[in-house]
Design a protein with these regions (language model features):
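N-terminal helical cap/lid subdomain that shapes the substrate entry/recognition surface
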Residues: 2-78
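Conserved Rossmann-like nucleotide-cofactor binding loop
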Residues: 10, 17, 98, 151, ...
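A mid-sequence interfacial segment
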Residues: 46, 91-112
Length: 192
């Protein structure tokens, strides 16, 4: 099985650090982390508009703030390595920078699982544009896309690739997981 993965909130539990970095950009510090997370789980663009943050301010400061947070505070989800080990090929499409992505993977000694990684530095349009997915699908014959947001799964559906929503029952997907220990009974056994 060849799997295309989202990174934040799918392989690694980075949302607490993403929310922390985003909150530093807000002038109103009374806004709850739950409210920020709710918007960020849709997309950063939705959160920027919702909280009335200037896009130029976000672009200039957010990734710098988030990258300063120690990788140890961005752990891999339990049992995700079982799925990574099972797959024949794993690839990533992320809006993170290449350096930040590689730093986290290296910190947790997980870079060896991935054949190819596409980051914001590679020049593809942001998800939900399907360009990066189409490139990886043509090259690696992707069987499944795993992500936690609608924008992660929409490009896969456009390309006719099966989808798996992680910790998000509110989005359309072929499979839904709340934990990766469900992967083999929910995804693999249903495809056998």
């Amino acid at each position: 099985m060849n799997i295309l993965w989202d990174f934040d909130g799918t392989i690694f539990d980075t949302y607490p650090t993403i929310v922390k970095a985003f909150k530093e950009l807000l002038t109103d510090q009374t806004i709850s982390e739950e409210d920020i997370l709710k918007q960020m789980k849709i997309s950063s663009d939705v959160a920027i508009k919702h909280f009335d943050i200037e896009k130029s301010l976000f672009d200039k400061h957010f990734h710098v703030l988030e990258q300063k947070i120690n990788p140890k505070d961005k752990p891999a989800f339990p049992h995700v390595e079982d799925v990574l080990s099972f797959a024949d090929t794993n690839v990533i499409v992320t809006h993170k920078s290449r350096q930040s992505t590689l730093d986290i993977l290296a910190f947790f000694n997980m870079e060896h699982y991935f054949t190819e990684i596409i980051t914001k530095d590679d020049g593809y349009k942001r998800k939900p544009d399907s360009g990066a997915y189409a490139y990886l699908h043509d090259k690696h014959q992707i069987d499944l896309v795993i992500g936690d947001r609608e924008l992660d799964l929409k490009p896969a559906r456009e390309l006719g690739i099966k989808t798996c929503a992680f910790q998000n029952d509110d989005i359309e997907a072929d499979y839904h997981l709340t934990s990766y220990d469900q992967f083999f009974t929910t995804v693999v056994n249903k495809n056998s």
